[in-house]
Curated annotation (Swiss-Prot):
Subunit structure: Interacts with the host kinesin light chain (KLC), a subunit of the kinesin-1 motor complex.
Gene name in the database record: pipB2
Domain topic, free-text comment: Contains various tandem pentapeptide repeats in the C-terminal region. The pentapeptide motif is required to efficiently recruit kinesin-1. No position is completely conserved in these repeats, whose consensus sequence is A-[DN]-[FLM]-X-X. The C-terminal 38 amino acid residues, specifically, the C-terminal motif LFNEF, are required for peripheral localization of PipB2 and redistribution of lysosomal-associated membrane protein (LAMP). The N-terminal 225 amino acid residues are sufficient for type III translocation and association with Sifs and SCVs, but not accumulation in peripheral vesicles.
Sorted UniProt keywords: Host membrane, Membrane, Repeat, Secreted, Virulence
UniProt name for this protein: Secreted effector protein PipB2
Domain named Pentapeptide repeat: residues: 162-201, 202-241, 247-286, 287-326
Subcellular location: Secreted; Host membrane
Organism the protein comes from: Salmonella paratyphi A (strain ATCC 9150 / SARB42)
Domain of life: Bacteria
One GO cellular component term noted in the UniProt record for this chain: extracellular region
InterPro entries recorded: 5peptide_repeat (IPR001646), PipB2_N (IPR048984)
SUPFAM superfamilies in the cross-refs: Pentapeptide repeat-like
NCBIfam families: PRK15196.1
Length: 350
């Protein structure tokens, strides 16, 4: 009896106190020598049973929250009760009149027996909000609720056309997710992982992607006006036809990105690296590319009028049929071929 209550209390503490992949593995692994032996001879039967119970706990919690709260932004109830979890009653008591501990108290009971644990309030609330987020956007619940950094686990999520205006997606894992046509205006995506995600046609204006991973992302036709992409990883990303007016990409890794047809008027790309990038028919008037690494980048039919290339690395950079009037190239490093091109056709601007 006590071992069953203790196991369920441990699962509740792991699921709603951490919610990470490591916490799930720890909570569902065999605990005793006997369980390890049975698990071995049943080809993981103990772990599978525990994982099923863990998943049921999460899904029951999500449904309970959804039915008791008017919307996911509302305050969490002071008492959340899950009845009949494997014959047990699970109660979460949040800090308030009946709980002055400052932590969430978890009580698992069956008959006269009970087990109690404590969960940090901040972690508990973050996990509950993540469950409600999945409910709102009809995403199946996952046993891994949060990333190791504490962001939502939304790996591979389908969020096409979703309204995520001003959403907090810091440190979230959205790798491989489909956000085509979604609205993330003013969303906070600092440190988030969008590797391989589809962001085509998304509205990302005024959003924060500082230090985010957008590697291999498909962002064709996205709007990134005034967005913060400082330190972001955009390697091999497709930014065809993007609007990036006054976008801050300083220090970003944009190696081998495709910026063809993009509008980068007054964009700040200082200190960014664009090695091997393809930039065809883009508008980059007054763009700031100071100290940028443009080695082997290819600029074709691009308007760079008034762009600042001071101290930039232009070794083996290709400029073909570009508008290079009013350029600043002080202390820029360039190959002989590039220097010859500038001297021949644009000497008055050097």
């Amino acid at each position: 009896m006590q071992r069953s209550l203790d196991s369920l209390a441990g699962m509740a503490t792991s699921a709603f106190g951490a919610g990470t992949s490591a916490a799930m593995r720890q909570a569902t692994s065999p605990k005793t020598i006997l369980e390890y032996i049975i698990n071995f001879f049943t080809c993981g039967g103990i772990r599978r049973r525990n994982e099923t119970q863990y998943q049921e706990l999460i899904e029951t919690m999500a449904e309970t929250l959804k039915s008791t709260m008017p919307d996911r932004g509302a305050p969490l109830p002071e008492n959340i009760i899950l009845d009949d979890m494997d014959g047990c009653r699970v109660e979460f008591n949040l800090p308030g009149e009946n709980n002055e501990a400052g932590q969430v108290i978890v009580r698992v009971s069956k008959g006269d027996h009970s087990e109690t644990r404590e969960i940090p309030l901040v972690s508990f609330e973050k996990i509950c909000r993540a469950l409600l987020f999945r409910c709102e956007f009809s995403l199946p619940q996952d046993s891994v609720i949060l990333t190791a950094q504490g962001g939502m686990n939304l790996k591979g999520a389908v969020l096409t056309g979703a309204n995520l205006t001003a959403e907090n997606l810091c440190d979230a894992d959205l790798s491989g997710a489909n956000l085509e046509g979604a609205v993330l205006f003013m969303a906070d995506c600092e440190g988030a992982n969008f590797k391989g995600a589809n962001l085509s046609g998304t509205s990302l204006g005024d959003s924060n992607f500082k230090n985010a991973c957008l590697e291999d992302g498909i962002m064709c036709g996205a709007t990134l006006d005034h967005a913060n992409l400082t330190g972001a990883n955009l390697q091999h990303a497709s930014l065809l036809g993007c609007s990036m007016i006054e976008c801050n990409c300083s220090g970003a890794n944009m190696d081998h990105t495709n910026l063809s047809g993009a509008t980068l008027i007054r964009a700040d790309m200082s200190g960014a690296t664009l090695q091997g990038a393809t930039i065809m028919a883009a508008i980059m008037e007054d763009a700031v590319l100071t100290r940028a690494n443009l080695r082997k980048a290819s600029f074709i039919s691009t308007n760079l009028d008034g762009a600042d290339l001071a101290e930039a690395n232009l070794n083996n950079t290709c400029f073909k049929d570009c508008t290079l009037t009013h350029l600043r190239t002080e202390d820029a490093t360039m190959s002989t071929s590039t220097q010859t091109l500038f001297n021949e056709f644009y000497s008055e601007n050097i």
